[in-house]
Amino acid sequence: VGANLQQVGEACAAGMFDLLEATVEKFQRASQTLKYAQVPTVAAVQGMALGGGCEFVMHASKRVMALESYVGLVEAGVGLIPAGGGCKEFAVRAADWAAQSATPGEVFNYLQPVFMTIAMAKVAKSAVEVVDFGFAKPSDTILFNANELLFVAIKEARALADAGYAPPPMARSIPVAGKNGIATFEMMLVN
């Protein structure tokens, strides 16, 4: 689970915006460090991974999840935008999904469902939904027996390392939907 949202609200009310910005920047650096580490990072997920916890899960090289896992970016439920890198990671994934489709230049159709996932603060209620919602990838591992979680996560990390793991290249440009997409998303929020 991520930041204490009550403390965030109190800091906002007190006008402590410099502290909030510094905290968010540190969290974003931590997320990026997970994603671009020179060694594989494997998230072992059981129970809840909400808010910042979800963002760390999204940035891992691989995820091993107990079937009974609850994962989501819940910040919008209290009027905040997730700021630890989850929104960016969803945009990167939407661009990847579009690039693999028949219409690689049209990213909007892939951004729309993840936008709704973020805006509605949807929480996946099983590891299968975690993949369906896009918080995890189809290649990630789902376990029925949660007692095997740590063993399998370590095994996956070793397998990635033995295969010569290299971090993904840094995303330099992420295609987005532009002004028309922003207008459509704003309309979706109002309706």
Locate each region found by the language model:
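Secondary-structure transition/capping motifs at alpha-helix termini
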Residues: 14-19, 33-39, 63-70, 93-110
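Gly/Pro- and small hydrophobic-enriched strand-loop and loop-to-helix capping segments
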Residues: 61-83, 134-149
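Intrinsically disordered, low-complexity segments enriched in small/flexible residues
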Residues: 97-126, 138-140, 144-191
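Hydrophobic/aromatic residues within transmembrane alpha-helices
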Residues: 4, 56-57, 130
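Acidic/glycine-enriched connector segments
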Residues: 5, 27-36
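Short helix- or helix-capping micro-motifs
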Residues: 90
